[in-house]
Amino acid sequence: MIITGHLILVRHGEPGLKPGERLSGWIDIPLSRKGIEEALECAKALENIEIDIAFASDLVRTQETLFIILSGQKKTGVVVHEKTEDKVPPEKLDWYSYPEKLGEDLIPVYTTPALNERYYGKLQGRKKQKMEEKYGAEQVANWRWNFEPGPPEGESLKAVYERTVPYFRKKVMPALEGGKNVLICAHQSSLRALVKYIEDISDKDIREVRLSTGELAIYHFSEGKLVRENEELGPELKRNI
């Protein structure tokens, strides 16, 4: 059975930095071996949902994860860079907009900085333990998990929300309204922002939302609303609210 009208949110697989040691942010680092395995597990979990269109951030770890997932469906992503789309209207990019002209195994993949991880400012790329020693573990945790404020010279979750959600409304919602199965591969912060918007989570409760690398959340688009499907939460999306 082919499933249609779904939104799949996937956090990228583990990056090459030691897990939990550094705050990656905008550091553009590829997947580790474990990250590749996590992406393969996502591909297996999604084998019954045929992806029609996909979105990723500008950072390579999300794109690697996404293409591994697509390869599990024997599909090839045709990348539409945001700058290309700005210069040439989508309706002129026939083979981007309608990849079935080149075969059903090709689907458009839109990459955008709107889905990037938060910029960590003075914490960017620094060892988490060192930052906790300098600022205090509680303060670092507040910067990372509260809706606002963000770290020194960096983005708060609110700032990420304000760039991620408008993009989602403009680019992703039309595809869902058209009955497409949409895959978004992004980061802890940008996905938390989307989950906050979709599930109408309060500024206070969003602190408890966590997504581990390689985890996913699936929503069904019905009657103009996105309804969560994998409510068991378990390994898919860890929430404690």
Swiss-Prot record:
GO terms for biological process: gluconeogenesis; glycolytic process. GO terms for molecular function: phosphoglycerate mutase activity. Pathway: Carbohydrate degradation; glycolysis; pyruvate from D-glyceraldehyde 3-phosphate: step 3/5. Its EC number is 5.4.2.11. The record marks 187 as: Transition state stabilizer. Pfam families: His_Phos_1 (PF00300). It catalyses: (2R)-2-phosphoglycerate = (2R)-3-phosphoglycerate. InterPro entries: His_Pase_superF_clade-1, His_PPase_superfam, Phosphogly_mut1. PANTHER family: PHOSPHOGLYCERATE MUTASE. Belongs to the phosphoglycerate mutase family. BPG-dependent PGAM subfamily. It is an enzyme of class 5 (isomerase). Substrate binds at residues 24-25, 61, 117-120, 128. Catalyzes the interconversion of 2-phosphoglycerate and 3-phosphoglycerate. It comes from Methanosarcina mazei (strain ATCC BAA-159 / DSM 3647 / Goe1 / Go1 / JCM 11833 / OCM 88). This is 2,3-bisphosphoglycerate-dependent phosphoglycerate mutase. SUPFAM superfamilies: Phosphoglycerate mutase-like (SSF53254). The active site is at residues 12, 117. Keywords: Gluconeogenesis, Glycolysis, Isomerase.
